[in-house]
Every structure is written in structure tokens, then in C-alpha cells.
UniProtKB/Swiss-Prot annotation:
Main location: secreted
Protein name: Tachykinin-related peptide 1
The organism of origin for this protein: Rhodnius prolixus
Cell location: Secreted
Keywords assigned by UniProt, alphabetized: Amidation, Neuropeptide, Secreted
Coiled coil regions, renumbered to chain: none
Amino acid sequence: SGPGFMGVR
């Protein structure tokens, strides 16, 4: 749910 790994966070 954010700018993390592929947007998975």
C-alpha cells in the first residue's frame, strides 16, 4: 500500500 516493493506494501 505504498512506494515499497512492487507496491505490495
